[in-house]
Amino acid sequence: MKIGGKIVSATLVLMGVLVGLIMVAMSLLLMDYVSKSTESEMEVATSGIKNELEQKKTQMFQLACGFAGNHELIRAIQANDRKAVFEVSKKLVKQMNAEYLTVSDASANVIVRSYDFEKFGDKVDNQFNVKTALAGKPIAAVETGSQIKLAVRAGAPIYDAAGKLIGCASTGVRLDNNHNLVDDMKKQFNADFTVFLGDTRLSTTIKNDKGERNIGTKSAPEVAETVLKHLVLDGTLFGS
């Protein structure tokens, strides 16, 4: 169904919730603020959001698997050469037009982050994609993180030539400071969209009177309560 010229004011809420040690549940909530908007229009918009995220999961899954199988990266890890791992990671990110690549060892200790050479040594086994990859299964999902607050993440195990697990390649597309998702959704559905983590706006098409995006602001309690009464679409995982 075409929404056409009708303006629908909507909010996309992405809330990452850790379940147990490894499970991450995401909820996508789409809210209609205009009474003229129909339920069928909201279903179309919700379906569009889901399809967009599924496409990103597929893309990130393929990227992670490609990074994990790169022979130059594998050799650098085996040589225990952080600088080489960093340089290879930056090159791969540029070649594949990716946002970032985080390489960790078999114990989930970060070897390098392609965007910050000095930030390493911390454990990332709290990330579902990393923990799953180090268990031998590549996977993609929407997750929260310590450095990158919200992203579509994918992790893939890295093996040496003998088939020994030596690490994990984790990549993704950021949702916390990347406004392409909400901007694309606004163009497609003639609506305003906001990405929330909890009740804090991470990305939004809504701007203040200075023309700046309302990033970092909180949602009003009554808005959150209303959103939770509307359609909820559970996020899904993508894996091999």
At which residue positions do the language-model features occur?
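Conserved acidic
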Residues: 2, 174
